[in-house]
Amino acid sequence: MIAAQLLAYYFTELKDDQVKKIDKYLYAMRLSDETLIDIMTRFRKEMKNGLSRDFNPTATVKMLPTFVRSIPDGSEKGDFIALDLGGSSFRILRVQVNHEKNQNVHMESEVYDTPENIVHGSGSQLFDHVAECLGDFMEKRKIKDKKSPVGFTFSFPCQQSKIDEAVLITWTKRFKASGVEGADVVKLLNKAIKKRGDYDANIVAVVNDTVGTMMTCGYDDQHCEVGLIIGTGTNACYMEELRHIDLVEGDEGRMCINTEWGAFGDDGSLEDIRTEFDREIDRGSLNPGKQLFEKMVSGMYLGELVRLILVKMAKEGLLFEGRITPELLTRGKFNTSDVSAIEKNKEGLHNAKEILTRLGVEPSDDDCVSVQHVCTIVSFRSANLVAATLGAILNRLRDNKGTPRLRTTVGVDGSLYKTHPQYSRRFHKTLRRLVPDSDVRFLLSESGSGKGAAMVTAVAYRLAEQHRQIEETLAHFHLTKDMLLEVKKRMRAEMELGLRKQTHNNAAVKMLPSFVRRTPDGTENGDFLALDLGGTNFRVLLVKIRSGKKRTVEMHNKIYAIPIEIMQGTGEELFDHIVSCISDFLDYMGIKGPRMPLGFTFSFPCKQTSLDAGILITWTKGFKATDCVGNDVATLLRDAIKRREEFDLDVVAVVNDTVGTMMTCAYEEPTCEVGLIVGTGSNACYMEEMKNVEMVEGDQGQMCINMEWGAFGDNGCLDDIRTHYDRLVDEYSLNAGKQRYEKMISGMYLGEIVRNILIDFTKKGFLFRGQISEPLKTRGIFETKFLSQIESDRLALLQVRAILQQLGLNSTCDDSILVKTVCGVVSRRAAQLCGAGMAAVVDKIRENRGLDRLNVTVGVDGTLYKLHPHFSRIMHQTVKELSPKCNVSFLLSEDGSGKGAALITAVGVRLRTEASS
């Protein structure tokens, strides 16, 4: 017993001693964490260079765009062929995907040889061989008569400009077929298939084995966004933000980047860690000076590295008592599979003895221990280096996402990772130390990269079908110039109907006389109160207007909320609330004594019989207060003031917000004769010739007409351009069948149109993984401000995702792109429709005056116009295209329509004074 313990102790001491000797001998191969972190930094820099348009031509890490933009989402289906060429054998698979049965994937495959004479022969020989194997495979399965979609895993560095094209940059591994470098491998394969003429195949996608691995694992885990191969060769790919990929147009979404990291160090950046053995391996390789990182880490070279170390140590008398055999000196006699066998925990030393005996060196126990440790150092260095480069990718992903902690999945394949007994454990452990702020799940690709090629093909098919359906849906929102000219023509016809006495009562566009007969002339003077009611907020203003050489307008205002229960309660409650707010404001300003003139901006359709009387025709914008429609709102206000018995006011003018906006801008710019509001609601007004206003006596001069154009289309004249979504929004609104034009244009409804489209797309599985969340079911969730933010050019997709998350919608990058697209289509149509309406107005003014050209200014207000990044530009462009004989300027109303109400009141007071004197 004691003897056995002594023997074990002696053997352990002996082993430790041998290990220390080897550690010392191979010191250069043992990399500290500090060195590995430095390598991470270097690789991160190389990645950046590869992605940059300026540095890519000279970058060693090529960072090749793959044009794979999306990982599987589980809805893929179909029957696909996959070719997998890149190693010692060539595999063909038939992959049948059925998403209805728990993502069921049925695969059958066959392996074909790629003999040396073919991989080192001509390109046409190689692709003839591939085409022959594919024909044999299809013949056996009786599918030669089908034009099957084919995914091609081609595991060599390729330049791609689309997913079904791949120009070989350089052969790697043992391949050297002539005439292929610089050529499109898809064309070469298609040519070989065509030459045979006995079957047809549609090559939909070419992918690298790394991309194939990511896609294979991505089918099982949708968080998989990195692919890693550690086998005969090594490489990695990951999903990069498109905005960082200079070589590809566009900045929306993500694309898989094939790093081709095997070439890391080809520019000399790893010389400080390369050893004499690495240099010797490189000198004896098929591609000296290339793939230097791969030659330090991949399965093709590890066995050879160990052999070179053993030869040198034997020559120096440190192993095998200096014995060197012809076998030990022969390249390829010591393989990576031998390294794996020797590093096994229990039988490793026994395996070492067997393998070394096969090489004829008659090893001692010491030799076996030493050789085992040499293998450990070489394979451990490989694991450490791969951990460093993968760590750089993970840090980049984390920074791209802007999250303090990354959670992701890495799909892995390759014989070294799979079969080496210690490799994966060491690799994971090092990675955790290097990137402690990343939680990484490693998912082994059980089916190789061939299934991934089929998945890329399936995704390409799914995306093409989705794209077709999305385009089909959104096409209904695209308006041609002819369609817009027709809208302009119809608006003009409706305007005429509203102006004529005979047709006015039945007209949809009411063309209401405002009794505002002129714009300010600069002589207005005095202090005026203004009320502004038109949305969920209500403003009370004190406006001090001073005339003279230096005209000034000084304003003080306070905003009050109108609760929903008052908006939809009784008329008395609404006007009592308004008077209560006025009372508070008069106290706040200390002006409750004198009877002041007041202008009331009342932004709802009213029939006016004079400047100070407006009979409400209908409520819009969510208001539903009872006992108001059909009554004079000025009288309702006066009655409420009387009920309060605190103060008195002189209600001089009832004006629409659009008229107020026109007057505000006309005070600054005399050519302003049109007012436009595009905010919660939408409306326009303009100065019409009195002779055309049949509803008011007299035909001298002009009068501002409040068009109430929101009701355009209420008679069905826009039904041919209204979509299914417009009808849905209308149906569920408070005023179904009314304000149809407004519901296609204004901020109150655009978000609802978007929401309904998103629900439809989610039901079809195009968005949010097909899950309709509670927030998405909530009406009114998409406010104008969110649409404006989402469509901002300055906003990266991450910020779009953040906005959607704020709304309770968890989106992927692809989801964010589609949401942004939908918002853009809906808001573009709104701007074009608004422009068509405005074109009708300015052309009418021009024709009224018999002018060949008209110069006119439009005063504009409203949140959609002000805040949306593209609305105003598209609207201006539309007006320009549809009314080429009008030079139209747009002036933003900075002070809102309240100031306009005060100016109208001032004009009214001036005219009243003039009349009485």
Curated annotation (Swiss-Prot):
Using the UniProt record, name the top-level EC class of this enzyme in a single word: transferase
Major location (coarse): mitochondrion
Quick one: which residues bind D-glucose 1?
A: 155, 172-173, 208-209, 235, 260, 291-294
Subcellular localization:
Mitochondrion outer membrane; Cytoplasm, Cytosol
Residue sites binding D-glucose 2 per the record: 603-604, 620-621, 656-657, 682-683, 708, 742
Give the region (Hexokinase large subdomain 1) as residue ranges: 208-447
Q: Which reaction does it catalyse?
A: a D-hexose + ATP = a D-hexose 6-phosphate + ADP + H(+); D-fructose + ATP = D-fructose 6-phosphate + ADP + H(+); D-glucose + ATP = D-glucose 6-phosphate + ADP + H(+); D-mannose + ATP = D-mannose 6-phosphate + ADP + H(+)
Q: Give the span(s) annotated as Hexokinase small subdomain 2.
A: 521-655
Q: What is its EC number?
A: 2.7.1.1
Q: Specify which residues bind D-glucose 6-phosphate 2 according to the UniProt entry for this protein.
A: 532-536, 657, 680, 861-863, 897
Fetch the InterPro entries from UniProt: ATPase_NBD, Hexokinase, Hexokinase_BS, Hexokinase_C, Hexokinase_N
Q: Which GO terms of type biological process are on file?
A: fructose 6-phosphate metabolic process; glucose 6-phosphate metabolic process; glucose metabolic process; glycolytic process; inflammatory response; innate immune response; intracellular glucose homeostasis; mannose metabolic process
Molecular function terms from GO: ATP binding; D-glucose binding; fructokinase activity; glucokinase activity; glucosamine kinase activity; mannokinase activity
Phosphoserine occurs at 337
UniProt domain Hexokinase: residue ranges:
16-458, 464-906
**Where along this sequence does the record place binding of D-glucose 6-phosphate 1?**
84-91, 209, 232, 413-415, 449
Q: Hexokinase large subdomain 2: where is this region?
A: 656-895
Q: Describe regulators of its activity.
A: Hexokinase is an allosteric enzyme inhibited by its product D-glucose 6-phosphate. Hexokinase activity is inhibited by N-acetyl-D-glucosamine.
Quaternary structure annotation from Swiss-Prot or TrEMBL:
Monomer. Interacts with RABL2/RABL2A; binds preferentially to GTP-bound RABL2. Interacts with VDAC1. The HK1-VDAC1 complex interacts with ATF2. Interacts (via N-terminal spermatogenic cell-specific region) with PFKM (via C-terminus). Interacts with SMAD5.
Q: Which family does it belong to?
A: Belongs to the hexokinase family.
**PANTHER family from the entry?**
HEXOKINASE, HEXOKINASE-1
Q: What is known of its domains?
A: The N- and C-terminal halves of this hexokinase contain a hexokinase domain. The catalytic activity is associated with the C-terminus while regulatory function is associated with the N-terminus. Each domain can bind a single D-glucose and D-glucose 6-phosphate molecule.
Protein name (record): Hexokinase-1
